[in-house]
Swiss-Prot record:
The keyword Glycoprotein does not apply. The lineage of its organism: Bacteria, Pseudomonadati, Pseudomonadota, Gammaproteobacteria, Enterobacterales. It comes from Escherichia coli (strain ATCC 8739 / DSM 1576 / NBRC 3972 / NCIMB 8545 / WDCM 00012 / Crooks). This is Leucine--tRNA ligase. Belongs to the class-I aminoacyl-tRNA synthetase family. Pfam families: Anticodon_1 (PF08264), tRNA-synt_1 (PF00133), tRNA-synt_1_2 (PF13603), tRNA-synt_1g (PF09334). GO terms for biological process: leucyl-tRNA aminoacylation. GO terms for cellular component: cytosol.
């Protein structure tokens, strides 16, 4: 064994061994308990960042630990390879998205291997390959036949100059990111999957997810947004149709003083024919990108349509306004407004001088003061005719019943959740497998024409999708009739909604899933990824699992038993102000800092002499130039050091502050272990441990070893507090470093301790542990070694510490055998000089003894 720890030498050797032995490849084995450990698959952006490293290290630690418990562990990896960034990069680098993507995959695969992650590479998949997306296309056609897929027009961001659809992130301050033209909202036909058909199940089954974070479940509950209310129909004077609204507060209905409709509503369109102001307003709304998140903060605007609706219960005429806070794609495109009891309606009514009618009393029973704001709390009705005096629940039911009896109301359960729009007007995605025949019939692409392959050898102009620009690509024949293929591609959330299931049978050619393999491995035992995926990916992931279950492919209701959301990785951020007042962000690697006595940064500059402003720790990002390249750190310290720091610096679900001093500390710890094993093995062979012949000190050290095994096992396995597990190992290492090594049993005990330490550290730092296990002559490869088991007998304390008090004041602490009687403890206490002097010449009037803990002698 060499004296110095050289990670650059041992890590490449160990990785080569894993590759050659195919150590982490697994197959179904009914004789073994399975464990499926999965980290969210990466987008092949070009380089790994520290967020990836943290996510995948957590997953690898769990997978390696479960493997050492004797389970059949599946830990696969793949690439979420479609998506918009590849199109931008292709244009910028004058290439096509496919070669850019495949080059990135090759580079990042090497980076993952360099970090020593124990993946089953035989199951690697890339979602941009026809071998993968063909099954998604087939499944989509089956969902269409089941009535779960439909096409309707929906609003998109449209650049009139480039004649193309823009993703939300390509709209900057209302303009096209590329040509700065003002963006319009345009209605175009798009494909949808009926996720709303599963809304109740998606909501109710959240209760089955005992090991998912409550925050994620709450976010999904709110996103699904189940509400119970009443749908109410209004007649409108001089208008051919009625208006329908939905409300969750029918108790406030007597306070409805106006209706508001979306700018795109047929009523608003009709009114605009003779109203130039309204026509201009509709035009303005059409050119505004309105995401739901922005609705709450934007200025509320509207124009009176001139139409009057009739309140079904009072018979009063109330105005109908077109308003920018109502969207056609939500509900009916019309809402009832109760300005006395809804703050948004109140602000709008105040702005335009509309009637505000209070109908709910304040909590103290007085009429509400509406001079500053609406009263939004529930309460008792007044000003409501026959419903006066009713509380919220009674009024809800009475008004709902009356409207229903009149034929103008219907109780409804509504959802905030909308059907999933899966059409994207982009190139780099899986083609949607639908065709339109010459006679206008729309139908799924026949099975014998699947997959519909995306051409990869294309020229990108940065404006139009190559498959939209090439009229020949869309041409096909179905049943002998000319037809045109759909040129939209799938939302990339489609691919990431079922990849976890395909990992169970990536080579299967008979269908989407091999049910036997899928049902052996599924559900996933632990799924690891960022909380930013709480409502989009993780909802579609659950939805797809239920679709596959209903298609007979899987037999479980949910895709993952446990979800672990790792915290973000933070780093110091610095900038200097440029000549034009702009902020120039400087990498923390290039910052020369001065610190105070507490280690806080008080001054910083860069190599060019710029005075730097320190903004504190923030999420590693390109925009703040504070990302730390994992590859540089691995080359400097080794993969094991980086992995150990990642797991030790913070609990897995909390933010992690990147500190290179902490990385250096992790590296020093690994060097200490290496040195201890080197010194131990240099002394030659070790005798067998005789546990019956140990001294008290040896027993105490062995007790510490086995208590550490018990704690680390609990911390990793049950609590998943990996940082405290490492801290416990470090504490034990400090004791081992001071332990005597001269005697035969000292060395035998050290051998047992080091074999345990190396196995406990193996999930965290597998390369050094692989090597040290060999040097310690552990049996076989450590990858197949069992997890150490704490010896219950070794942990039993044979002595205990008893506090001795005289008249309630502590006078001594004594060590006694655990089975000592009260008499023996009193006798031992009396031998202590500090106790004896207080007992001299006095009478012990009372003895209070708490066995094994406390002896209090009351004297007088």
């Amino acid at each position: 064994m060499q004296e110095q720890y050289r990670p650059e030498e041992i890590e490449s050797k160990v990785q080569l061994h894993w590759d050659e032995k195919r150590t982490f490849e697994v197959t179904e084995d009914e004789s073994k308990e399975k464990y499926y450990c999965l980290s969210m698959l990466p987008y092949p952006s070009g380089r790994l960042h520290m967020g990836h490293v943290r996510n995948y290290t957590i997953g690898d630690v769990i997978a390696r630990y479960q493997r050492m418990l004797g389970k059949n562990v599946l830990q696969p990896i793949g690439w979420d390879a479609f998506g918009l960034p590849a199109e931008g990069a292709a244009v910028k680098n004058n290439t096509a998205p496919a070669p850019w993507t495949y080059d990135n995959i090759a580079y990042m695969k090497n980076q993952l291997k360099m970090l020593g992650f124990g993946y089953d590479w035989s199951r690697e998949l890339a979602t941009c390959t026809p071998e993968y997306y063909r099954w998604e296309q087939k499944f989509f056609t089956e969902l269409y036949k089941k009535g779960l897929v439909y096409k309707k027009t929906s609003a998109v961001n449209w650049c009139p100059n480039d004649q193309t659809v823009l993703a939300n992130e390509q709209v900057i301050d209302g303009c096209c990111w590329r040509c700065d033209t003002k963006v319009e909202r345009k209605e175009i036909p798009q494909w949808f999957i009926k996720i709303t058909a599963y809304a109740d199940e998606l909501l109710n089954d959240l209760d089955k997810l005992d090991h998912w974070p409550d925050t994620v479940k709450t976010m999904q509950r709110n996103w699904i947004g189940r509400s119970e209310g009443v749908e109410i129909t209004f007649n409108v004077n001089d208008y051919d149709n009625t208006l329908t609204v939905y409300t969750t507060r029918p108790d406030t209905f007597m306070g409805c003083t106006y209706l508001a409709v979306a700018a795109g509503h047929p009523l608003a369109q009709k009114a605009a024919e003779n109203n130039p102001e309204l026509a201009a307003f509709i035009d303005e709304c059409r050119n505004t990108k309105v995401a739901e998140a922005e609705m709450a903060t934007m200025e509320k605007k509207g124009v009176d349509t001139g139409f009057k609706a009739v309140h079904p219960l009072t018979g009063e005429e109330i105005p109908v306004w077109a308003a920018n806070f109502v969207l056609m794609e939500y509900g009916t495109g019309a809402v009832m407004a109760v300005p006395g009891h809804d703050q948004r309606d109140y602000e709008f009514a105040s702005k335009y001088g509309l009637n505000i009618k209070p109908v709910i009393l304040a909590a103290d029973g007085s009429e509400p003061d509406l001079s500053q704001q609406a009263l939004t709390e529930k309460g008792v009705l007044f000003n409501s005719g026959e419903f006066n005096g009713l509380d919220h629940e009674a009024a809800f039911n009475a008004i709902a019943d009356k409207l229903t009896a009149m034929g103008v109301g219907e109780r409804k359960v509504n959802y905030r959740l909308r059907d999933w729009g899966v059409s994207r007007q982009r190139y780099w995605g899986a083609p949607i497998p639908m065709v339109t025949l010459e006679d206008g019939t729309v139908m799924p692409t026949p099975d014998d024409q699947l997959p519909v392959i995306l051409p990869e050898d294309v020229v990108m102009d940065g404006i139009t999708s190559p498959i939209k620009a090439d009229p020949e690509w869309a041409k096909t024949t179905v049943n002998g009739m000319p037809a045109l293929r759909e040129t939209d591609t799938f939302d990339t959330f489609m691919e990431s909604s079922w990849y976890y299931a395909r990992y169970t049978c990536p080579q299967y050619k008979e269908g989407m899933l091999d049910s036997e393999a899928a049902n052996y491995w599924l559900p996933v035992d632990i799924y690891i990824g960022g909380i930013e995926h709480a409502i989009m990916h993780l909802l579609y992931f659950r939805f797809f699992h239920k679709l596959m279950r209903d298609a007979g492919m899987v037999n479980s209701d949910e895709p993952a038993k446990q979800l672990l959301c790792q915290g973000m990785v933070l780093a110091d951020a610095f900038y200097y102000v440029g000549e034009n007042g702009e902020r120039n962000w400087v990498s923390p690697v290039d910052a020369i800092v001065e610190r105070d006595e507490k280690g806080r940064i008080v001054k910083a500059k860069d190599a060019a002499g710029h005075e730097l402003v320190y903004t504190g720790m923030s999420k590693m990002s390109k925009s703040k130039n504070n990302g730390i390249d994992p590859q540089v750190m691995v080359e400097r310290y080794g993969a094991d050091t980086v992995r150990l720091f990642m797991m030790f610096a913070s609990p897995a679900d909390m933010t992690l502050e990147w500190q290179e001093s902490g990385v250096e500390g992790a590296n020093r710890f690994l060097k200490r272990i290496w040195k201890l094993v080197y010194e131990h093995t240099a002394k030659g062979d070790v005798a067998a441990l005789n546990v019956d012949a140990l001294t008290e000190d040896q027993k105490a050290l062995r007790r510490d070893v086995h208590k550490t095994i018990a704690k680390v096992t609990d911390d990793i396995g049950r609590r998943q507090t990996f940082n405290t597990a490492i801290a416990a190992i470090m504490e034990l290492m400090n004791k081992l470093a001071k332990a005597p090594t001269d005697g035969e049993q000292d060395r035998a005990l050290m051998q047992e301790a080091l074999l345990a330490v190396v196995r406990m550290l193996n999930p965290f730092t597998p390369h050094i542990c692989f090597t040290l296990w060999q040097e310690l002559k552990g049996e076989g490869d450590i990858d197949n070694a069992p997890w150490p088991v704490a010896d219950e007998k070794a942990m039993v304390e044979d002595s205990t510490l008893v506090v001795v008090q005289v008249n309630g004041k502590v006078r001594a602490k004594i060590t006694v055998p655990v089975d000592a009687t009260e008499e023996q403890v009193r006798e031992r206490a009396g031998q202590e000089h500090l106790v004896a002097k207080y007992l001299d010449g006095v009478t012990v009037r009372k003895v209070i003894y708490v066995p094994g803990k406390l002896l209090n002698l009351v004297v007088g």
